[in-house]
Structures are given as structure tokens and as C-alpha cells.
Amino acid sequence: HILIILTYLAHETERHYLCSMKQELKENGGLPAHILWTLAIVAGVSVANLYYNQPLLNIMRHELEVSEFKTNLIAMITQIGYALGLLFIVPLGDLYRRKNIILTNFFLLIFSLLAIAMAPNIYIIWAASLITGICSMIPQIFVPIASQFSRPENKGRNVGVVISGLLTGILASRVVSGFVGEVLGWREMYFIAAGMMLLC
């Protein structure tokens, strides 16, 4: 029931945000500051999901009682998923409505993060990590959005803001997950990650 409620709220939040963005924006018409910074923040929060696992691998290995090799595969599978997302999902933004792609990826991302948090074994974590990696390519859709709706003279600056948000997420994710993992536990980190995606 909790999962159903969370996914419903995620869908409604993103639908409201994207509908309002659609109403306000016109191509080359200018990107309002609040939307630009929302794109940057969500880009950072989304891409951070790729790196939360790295400081947590040792803690996960001891709790799940698996080999170091199997645990290290979590990080590798996540990055493979990201590569697959870049290869197969991002190009769909030129063929289909970006709104639908973003909504679908948000839904799947929240689901996969919750699946990792509640996973009873390493195999479910592997599968959920692959989905997490695939769906964490959302920032790569935000970059062309920032470019498309910015005025010509602001395109470079606005794209830079979104990319800065992305890079901040990459750098901050390991610090945050390492701290939360030591204080609360690795499962709690993924519950927090799902909550952050929901708030976005």
C-alpha cells in the first residue's frame, strides 16, 4: 500500500510540474529562473542515484553475507544500466513526448530505489540497480529542454546551470551516502533517495 501511495504521489507531482512547464514555455521564448533551477536540482538528485551504492558496498556485503565480487557487481550493473539508458532511452526524446519519458522514468526510478531498500537478497538488488541506472539518465533529457526553451543569448548559461546541478549531484552523492550509511544504514539511504525523488 505504501508503494502504491508513493508512486501515485510521484506521478501526480510530476504531472502537475510538467503541465505547468508546458503552459509557460515556448521554444526560444525564455526559461523562467524557477524552472531552470528546478531542472538543475532534479538533475543532481537524479544522477546521484548512480553513486549512492559506492560507499555502501562494504556495509551491504556484511549484511547480505555475500562475496566482495558479488557486492562490487552492484556498482558495475548500475553503470551498465546508465549506459543503456543513454544509448536507448535518451534518443527517444526526439521521437516521443519528453513529458511521458520523464514521468515513466520517475515512476520506475522510485520503484527501483524502494526495491533496493527492501531487497532480501543480492539478486533483487542487481535487477533494481540495473533499472536505477537506466532511469537515472533523466538529466540528459533536461539538458536539451534547457537549450530548447532558453533565449538564444542565454542557451549556454542555462545549459551550464543544469550541468552544474548534475555535477554537484555526482560529487555530493558519495559524501551523503557514506554519512547516512554509517549513521542510519544502507537501506535507509535508499529510502531517503526514493523520498528525494518523490519531493522533486
Where in the sequence are the language-model features?
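Structural signature of transmembrane alpha-helices in multi-pass secondary transporters
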Residues: 46, 75-78, 82, 132, ...
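Membrane-interface helix termini in secondary transporters
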Residues: 59, 90-91, 179
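Cytoplasmic helix-loop-helix junction between adjacent transmembrane helices
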Residues: 128-164
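Conserved MFS/SLC helix-loop-helix module at the cytosolic interface between two early adjacent transmembrane helices
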Residues: 84-120
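Residue-level signature of mid-helix packing/kink "hotspots" within the transmembrane helices
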Residues: 51, 79-87, 137, 170-171
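Paired small-residue
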Residues: 112, 123-131
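Extracytoplasmic
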Residues: 41-68
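Helix-loop-helix hairpin linking two adjacent transmembrane segments in secondary transporters
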Residues: 124, 161-200
